[in-house]
């Protein structure tokens, strides 16, 4: 079975790790749009990766036929708004560490999914986003843009 998400996830996880390694504490506290900070955005990434990790763990425990349901797109904004205060409350360096560690854990779990689980997920309309890379890329690009060209890479 073709699993293009594995290499893409690995690539964006490496970008995430490299970004976190070079961010100073001052960088992590830098404000972004809508009241977020760089550290809070990293915590946000950890939150959504942890969601996928939890869904996979429950799915594997409950059996192949218990495919998780998709999240309603209109719920994403209020979930993000609700989680923002928690993301901002984390110590900035802890948020960065959590983002990398959770990305490591979810990518290992996604890569280890059985072919039956991957096929069942696809048949259900991909309620579990195996391409963790897409969300990471969006926010890594956002952070690099905020840092400016001299600090981005």
What is each residue range found by the language model?
Residues 1-25, 47, 51-58:
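Alpha-helical bundle segments that constitute or directly flank the non-heme di-iron/ferroxidase center
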Residues 26-30:
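Short, charged helix-helix connector/hinge segments
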Residues 7, 31-78, 115-153:
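Short, contiguous alpha-helical
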Residues 8, 74-117:
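Acidic/histidine-rich alpha-helical segments that form the ligand environment
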Residues 20-23, 63, 103, 110-117, ...:
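A general structural signal marking secondary-structure boundaries and capping sites
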Residues 12-19, 48-51, 102-105, 109, ...:
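Amphipathic, well-ordered alpha-helical segments in soluble domains
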């Amino acid at each position: 079975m073709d699993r293009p998400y594995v290499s893409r996830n690995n690539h964006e996880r490496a970008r995430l790790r490299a970004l976190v390694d070079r961010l100073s504490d001052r960088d992590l506290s830098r404000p972004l749009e809508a009241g977020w900070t760089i550290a809070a955005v990293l915590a946000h990434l950890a939150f959504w990766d942890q969601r996928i990790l939890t869904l996979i763990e429950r799915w594997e425990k409950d059996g192949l036929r218990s495919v998780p349901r998709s999240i309603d797109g209109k719920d994403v904004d209020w979930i993000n708004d609700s989680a923002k205060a928690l993301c901002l409350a984390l110590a900035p360096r802890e948020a960065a560490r959590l983002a990398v560690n959770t990305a490591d854990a979810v990518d290992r779990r996604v890569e280890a999914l059985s072919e039956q689980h991957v096929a069942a997920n696809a048949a259900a309309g991909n309620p579990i986003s195996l391409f963790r890379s897409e969300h990471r890329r969006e926010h890594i690009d956002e952070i690099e843009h905020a840092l400016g060209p001299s600090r981005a890479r």
